[in-house]
A protein has these predicted regions:
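Phosphate/pyrophosphate-binding catalytic cores of soluble transferases and nucleic-acid-acting enzymes
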Residues: 1-285
Length: 285
């Protein structure tokens, strides 16, 4: 396929303005919008996940929004299987796929291919949980000193995962990660993407505004309707807090406060992720 229809990626923290920027790009490039957000894949949580409204979508074609039932499971691997044919079909018509979202791992599967890292082993993880952090670090340092030097050494879960990768593969986690970092896929050459960056105070203000709007425009009703439905959707920020509000455990104001705090923390993690993606062009807003 022509490199002129190669996907363009719009990434950034929640509430950074990705939807508006992606629509502007779609207009300039004769493109179509492709979802790159883990929670906007699900039906029934459009407000909670801040999916683009019908008004925002305008005349542009949108793909992979609200395509999964809330009871379904989805991970980066399944997303990759879903999005590949969508992108190919868009490009076959001479259009540019504009992939927009803040789910870094999902987007990385698309830009670099599926992760070579193995899935977790329940039995092995249970055994590690019984060991001390110091003991795990000593073993990781012996097997993979590079990984031991760069892993978050105060977060036991991260150390467990690094050691788990080494033990399951018989190799070094650092080398597997590095190989994936260097890898690019033909469909994405040349890689083109934008990381939207806002001043911290501005982003926090936008998060607060979005949270107020979300609670007033139907997020509470979405969570109430899906009561008893288990699935990945429950991991969305706001679900836990709204459930506490609905049960009478906390007030609406406290619910709002907790959602704002959780969203800020999530935005910080997103920024950390995208900062590592050196191929992304930084765009200050």
């Amino acid at each position: 396929m022509s490199e002129f229809t190669a996907p363009v990626f719009v990434c950034g923290a929640t509430a950074s303005g990705k939807t508006g920027y992606a629509l502007k790009l779609a207009a300039e490039l004769d493109g179509e919008i492709v979802n790159g957000d883990a929670f906007q894949l699900f039906r029934g949580i459009e407000v909670l996940s801040a999916a683009p409204t019908e008004e925002e979508r305008g005349d542009f074609s949108h793909h992979l929004f609200g395509v999964l039932d809330p009871a379904e499971s989805c991970d980066a691997g399944r997303y990759f299987e879903m999005v590949e044919p969508v992108i190919s079909e868009i490009r076959s018509r001479g259009k540019v796929p504009v992939v927009v979202g803040g789910s870094g791992l999902y987007l990385k599967f698309l830009t670099h291919g599926p992760s070579p890292l193995p899935k977790g082993d329940v039995a092995m993880r249970a055994e590690m949980e019984r060991r001390t952090l110091e003991d795990l670090l000593l073993e990781l340092e012996r097997i993979d000193p590079v990984e031991a030097a760069q892993v978050n050494r105060v977060n036991k879960r991260y150390v467990e995962r690094s050691l788990e990768i080494c033990l399951l593969t018989g190799g070094k986690a650092s080398e597997l990660r590095d190989g994936w970092e260097r890898k690019t896929r033909d469909i994405e050459k040349p890689l083109k993407g934008f990381w939207l960056i806002r001043d911290r105070a501005d982003l926090h203000q936008r998060i607060e505004k979005r949270t107020v709007q979300m609670l007033s425009e139907g997020a509470v009703e979405e969570v109430r309707r899906l009561d008893g439905v288990s699935g990945n959707w429950e991991k969305a920020i706001g679900v836990k807090e709204i459930r506490r509000f609905l049960s009478g455990e906390i007030s609406r104001d406290k619910c709002e406060e907790l959602i704002v705090f959780a969203t800020r923390q999530y935005a910080k993690r997103q920024e950390t992720w995208f900062r590592r993606e050196k191929w992304l062009e930084r765009v200050g807003l």
